[in-house]
Amino acid sequence: MSKTVYDYMDWPEIEAVVYGEETAPRDVMGPRLTPDGVLIQGFFPEARAAAVVTGRTKYEMELEDEAGYYAVLIPGRRIPDYEFQVEFEKETKNFKDAYAFGGLLTEEDERAFLGGVYYEAYKKMGAHPMVMNGVAGTHFAVWAPNAVRVSVVGEFNNWDGRALPMHKMPMSGLFELFIPGVKAGDAYRYEIKAKGDVLLQKADPYGNRTQPAPLWNSVVADVSDFTWNDSGWMAERKKYDDRRQPVSIYETSLGQWKSGKELVAFAKEKGYTHVELHPVMEFLEDGSDGYPTSAYFAVSTRYGTPAEFAALVDELHQVGIGVILDWSPAQFPRYAGGLEKFDGTPLYEVKDPEMAVHPMWGTMLYNYDSPMVMDFLISNACFWLEVFHVDGLRMDDVDAMLYLDYGRKDGWTPNMYGSNENLQAIEFLKHLNSILKKRDPGALLIAQEDGLWPELTDSVENDHIGFDYKWSGGWTRDFLFYLSVDPILRKNYHDQLTLSTLYAYSEHYILTLGSRDVGSLEEFMAKLPGDEKQKLAQVREAYSYMMVHPGCKMMAPGAAIPEELGKCIQALNTLYKSSPALYQMDDEYDGFEWVQLMKYEENVITFLRKTEKPEETLLVICNFAAIPYENYQVGVPFAGKYKEIFNSDAAEFGGEGVVNSRVKTAKAEECDEREHSIKVKLPALGVSIYSCTPGKAPARKKVTAAKTAKDKTAGKLVRTVKAKTPAKKSVKEEKATKVEEAVKAEKKAETVKKRATVKNDNNKADRNSK
């Protein structure tokens, strides 16, 4: 060892490198200028010899520590372009010095990260192939604040955690390193040395790809390497008002399809506006349908590459179909390479061990009190919406986030006020939804929540949580229970059918007959009474009733369904999208009106779906009895023509063909407390939908000259009569008047009561004074 090189050795730092405890390797290794030339140091465990090569010149390095620490002084006053040549037992490798390159993370990044506002963390965290200073490689970044040391390991360094320790940012606990030569497709992990000399190997929380089971290593991927063709769609999405548009969602898993093209063709043919995909993110267990998520930023290897998934989204957009992803910000799985105790300490999970594991699922719950965990989840949501152009997120198990005692009989810790609300989760959801809406106003944010949290879909500005929609679990449970009852007994459970209209406007709802609700078509049919033909009739009736009930729609009939059922669904979606009455006033009381809801003996309900235009009104008649009805009289909203535009019992849908092919003209026969009515055929276990065309007003009589003169003579009388004859009020005005009169009557009664009370009190006072 030369005396000059020896004099430049920082032995305590070299010892930290050799023992795998160095957190600032860029300050020790790599090149630096000295008065005696350029000092270059490197650590190559198991190496036999090492040299620095600059152009055609080779400088042998001196072994400073027998563990494999080498150094050399080369002449010059500027750092040259160089590479290492290292001889191992079986091979000699030439590679660039990772510590000759600076980092990407800045103090501004650190401050945003620590503040919980690092919404684009996905752009720098994880592994990103790039060119730095003209050299191709990959930049790695990970958060492990309590780690003694973090290294990147892979085939490129024989999975040796001593070889490439990462540089720790002083303020945040973020580690980063640019490694020349590492490229897309290379597998890697982080080796984390925790306190107590414990070595952990962890997958990258921000990794964009994984190896399949049983390895689950992270894989370097370039997710920006795709050319999109949906610029028009994305521009329209920013101004999309889903509350005034039809939303019919097809729920499915990519695992059900041989190819993405098949899914695109199916969804387009059936007329859906959106598809909702079970988690496409990586997950551990086959058969779990994607839950829980193990790699949040990676498309599952089961479904192909990131580029293939991007192509699927792009194709769906080009045929006018939006894409919603199931997303799980509530929990993550327990496995050695996952987020649990990532750096040897509770980092992503709740710190209280009693509250960290959910007893129902055995999964870990996120610590929403941590700004850095918020960064991880919010940037993940932004990642799917912005990088993969996804149009919405359906958030799973929101009730498990909102309630501290969800699924727990005991062993839970109340909040600071002694109640069961998870205050940190509430604030996280408000933060998440407000940021996503600010960045992408057209993104759909949907909650799956059954805990009856009030006003979940009201805005964050009103101090609520700010979802666009929530699943209507109450409607689904009540309706499926009603359908499971034999039609003969359904009259005893009629309220299960009508109850939902009492709360249909309390939230912005999506009605679901999804995979969780009914399973496959075979499983759905197994829940229903009757023979196979009756079961299929009730499946058609169920989808039809959902389509005409207030609320957006989501269904999961599966890919392999009978042709007739497919035609029925296609017809329903076509009708739904072309009928403003079925979606335009979903959130308004005036968009729905009962005609008859009390015919429980007959298992029949009748109602109207409306807009502000009478000619767009639809009349809906649902017969949940197993028998048809002939000449069934129904009250109608006005005189005019009524044409059956859909019947779930049509022969083309596999039904009996009990339809009304002729247009019905309303007659002035009172029914259902209405002046006009029609008589129709009702199919058993069927839904009929009628368009309503108001009748023309009667033509005015021709006025004669004599009549005109008479009217002029009696002008004063005519004006007097007109003044005394009030204009006919609309139904809406009449309702408002009645409500106003009722309120006035109630106030008057209350005033009279108060006066009587005061009078009695005065009388008592007078008697007492006497």
Model-derived regions: residue spans:
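Alpha-helical packing segments of well-folded alpha/beta enzyme cores
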Residues: 263, 308, 312, 373, ...
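Carbohydrate-interacting/catalytic domains
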Residues: 1-246, 255, 261-268, 491, ...
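Substrate-binding/active-site clefts of carbohydrate-active enzymes
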Residues: 211-212, 225-226, 231-249, 253-421
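Soluble or luminal CAZymes and related metallo-dependent hydrolases
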Residues: 258-259, 305-308, 372-377, 421-428, ...
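Generic structural signal for small/hydrophobic residues in well-ordered secondary structure
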Residues: 142, 190, 252, 277, ...
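An acidic- and aromatic-residue-enriched active-site/binding cleft used to recognize and process polar
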Residues: 145-147, 155-157, 193-195, 280-282, ...
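Hydrophobic residues within beta-strands of alpha/beta enzymes
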Residues: 50, 150, 275-277, 393-395, ...
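Conserved alpha/beta catalytic core and glycan-binding cleft of carbohydrate-active enzymes
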Residues: 389-391, 406-559, 577-634, 638-649, ...
